[in-house]
């Protein structure tokens, strides 16, 4: 388990978050700080019709990730589907934390951009976030082990 302070992608807030973490660090390294891009419950239709953003989801996520990197953050929360394009453009050291992870036979519920743990690995996710797949399982520990093994390869 990892704990990352997160901020919604706004340049001034992101820079302030880094400054605060630097000023308050108690050891040699400050905690990692990541920003949130587009939630995995959003898709292109929501972007176009509800948020009125006239661009592709991939371009929006990459732009927000670029803003986060330029502000000095360590990474972003994004769909596994955008992880590879982020790493291709911003480098593998830039962290992608990817929710929306489901096993192949799971319901996607309200999520629109989901992948399996193995696909998240192939798409270069740095870390995965798994919720309902484990918490809704009849055997959460066995499900956790399966997810872990699938992600590790």
Predicted features by range, described:
Residues 2-9:
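Short, small-residue-biased leader/transition segments that mark boundaries at the very start
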Residues 10-35, 45-46, 53, 65, ...:
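Non-catalytic structural scaffold of enzyme domains
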Residues 14, 65, 83, 117-118:
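Generic hydrophobic/aromatic pocket-lining and core-packing "Φ" positions
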Residues 14-20, 121, 134-153:
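C-terminal helical cap(s) of enzyme catalytic domains, especially alpha/beta-barrels
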Residues 32-61, 85-127, 139:
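Active-site-adjacent loop and "lid" segments of alpha/beta metabolic enzymes
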Residues 59-86:
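Internal active-site segments that recognize and position negatively charged phosphoryl groups
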Residues 68, 86, 120, 131, ...:
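Conserved, mostly hydrophobic/aromatic
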Residues 77, 128-129:
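Conserved beta-strand positions in the central sheet of alpha/beta enzyme cores
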